[in-house]
C-alpha cells in the first residue's frame, strides 16, 4: 500500500515537472492556481510577457494587421521588414532590403506595381543609380550591365 502511494506521488510529480510551457504561460496569463500543488508555487515561473503582446519575428499567414512584417529582425514590432512576401502592401515597400533605414531603396524588388525607376536587382549604395540587372518593359533601363560607365549596357536583350 505504501509503495503504491509512493509510486503514484512520484508519477504525479514527474507529470508536473514535464508540464508544457504553453500551459504555464496560459496559467500565468489567467492567474490560475492548481489546488493540489499550491504549496509548490511560491511565485510566477517567469516574468516574460505573454505571446499575445509580442509582434512575431516570423509570421506565416494572409490575415494580419496592415504593415505587419512576415520576417522581421529587431526588437521593435513596428520595424520595417527586411524580407516581406505578400501582395497587399505599399508600392514602395521592398521585398528584400539590406540595411537599417526603412526608407532605403530596395536592392532586390519583385512585383508588377513597382515604379519604373525602382530597380529589380541593384548593387551599390546609391539608390538613384541605374540598376545593374533590370527585367521589365522599359527600353531605357539596361537588362544586364557590368562596369562603371552607365551610358549603355554591356549586355542587352531587347528590341531597342
Swiss-Prot record:
Tell me one GO biological process term. Answer: regulation of cellular response to heat
The gene that this protein is the product of is flp-13
GO MF annotation terms: neuropeptide receptor binding
Q: Which UniProt keywords apply?
A: Amidation, Cleavage on pair of basic residues, Neuropeptide, Repeat, Secreted, Signal
- Please tell me one Gene Ontology term that the record gives under cellular component: extracellular region
Q: What is the lineage of its organism?
A: Eukaryota, Metazoa, Ecdysozoa, Nematoda, Chromadorea
Protein location: Secreted
Which residues lie in the propeptide? 18-43
> What PANTHER family is this protein classified in?
FMRFAMIDE-LIKE NEUROPEPTIDES 13 (PTHR20986:SF15), FMRFAMIDE-RELATED PEPTIDES (PTHR20986)
InterPro entries recorded? FMRFamid-related_peptide-like, FMRFamide-related_np
| Name of the protein described by the UniProt record | FMRFamide-like neuropeptides 13
- Residues modified as Phenylalanine amide are 60, 73, 85, 98, 110, 123, 135, 146, 157
The entry sums up its family as follows: Belongs to the FARP (FMRFamide related peptide) family.
Amino acid at each position: 500500500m505504501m509503495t503504491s502511494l509512493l509510486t503514484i506521488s512520484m508519477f504525479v510529480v514527474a507529470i508536473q515537472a514535464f508540464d508544457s510551457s504553453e500551459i504555464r504561460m496560459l496559467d500565468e496569463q489567467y492567474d490560475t492556481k492548481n489546488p493540489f500543488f499550491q504549496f509548490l508555487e511560491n511565485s510566477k515561473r517567469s516574468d516574460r510577457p505573454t505571446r499575445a503582446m509580442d509582434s512575431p519575428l516570423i509570421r506565416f499567414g494572409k490575415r494580419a494587421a496592415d504593415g505587419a512584417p512576415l520576417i522581421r529582425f529587431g526588437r521593435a514590432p513596428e520595424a520595417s521588414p527586411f524580407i516581406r512576401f505578400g501582395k497587399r502592401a505599399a508600392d514602395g515597400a521592398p521585398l528584400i532590403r539590406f540595411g537599417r533605414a526603412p526608407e532605403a531603396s530596395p536592392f532586390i524588388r519583385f512585383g508588377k506595381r513597382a515604379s519604373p525607376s525602382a530597380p529589380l536587382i541593384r548593387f551599390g549604395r546609391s539608390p538613384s543609380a541605374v540598376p545593374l540587372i533590370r527585367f521589365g518593359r522599359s527600353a531605357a533601363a539596361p537588362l544586364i550591365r557590368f562596369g562603371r560607365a552607365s551610358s549603355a549596357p554591356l549586355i542587352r536583350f531587347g528590341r531597342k
